[in-house]
Amino acid sequence: MKNKVVVIVGVPGVGSTTVTNKAIEELKKEGIEYKIVNFGTVMFEIAKEEGLVEHRDQLRKLPPEEQKRIQKLAGKKIAEMAKEFNIVVDTHSTIKTPKGYLPGLPAWVLEELNPDIIVLVEAENDEILMRRLKDETRQRDFESTEDIGEHIFMNRCAAMTYAVLTGATVKIIKNRDFLLDKAVQELIEVLK
């Protein structure tokens, strides 16, 4: 039986990692196992090993050709893992760079991963802004609520494009303030 590959995406600060971790925890209790792989972490490990970055948030500042090369290497590494486990790939649908939006899952990565489902985790623009302002653990560029809305729109466009190329389904889950459990439950149903 083919292992499931589920890609979970969201703009920075939306809480996609939190929703994913809680859903996977609950599924484990039911005997359903997934390995969570953060695409950015795999990219960071490769870039750090090569001496290109010191901290993760520097990745998006690398020249686009470097980012693309590292993406390809990360895609190959994750595809190897998917041969052994059900995989949840925690990543970004698009990455906002100084030169424009970079697809988080370009064709060369999609070919490797061949996802079954793409899940977009979203929230209201102002909720995301407030979460970012409270998070002192990351070095993020400031974005207005309008910028965040544009990024969410670009993520949706990219996710549907990825689906057209792979045949994956696309599910949108809202992670609203004080409704984390609802978002977690929705993701559990998608992953079952």
Swiss-Prot record:
InterPro entries, sorted: Adenylate_kinase_AdkA, P-loop_NTPase
Annotated binding of ATP, by residue: G10, V11, P12, G13, V14, G15, S16, T17, T18
Enzyme class per UniProt: transferase
The keyword Chaperone appears for this protein: no
Record note on temperature dependence: Active from 70 to 90 degrees Celsius.
Pfam family, one: AAA_17
Compartment(s) of residence: Cytoplasm
Reactions it catalyzes: AMP + ATP = 2 ADP
Annotated EC: 2.7.4.3
Similarity comment text for this entry: Belongs to the archaeal adenylate kinase family.
Subunit: Monomer.
NCBIfam families hit by this protein: PRK04040.1
Name this polypeptide is given: Adenylate kinase
Organism the protein comes from: Methanocaldococcus jannaschii (strain ATCC 43067 / DSM 2661 / JAL-1 / JCM 10045 / NBRC 100440)
Gene that specifies this protein: adkA
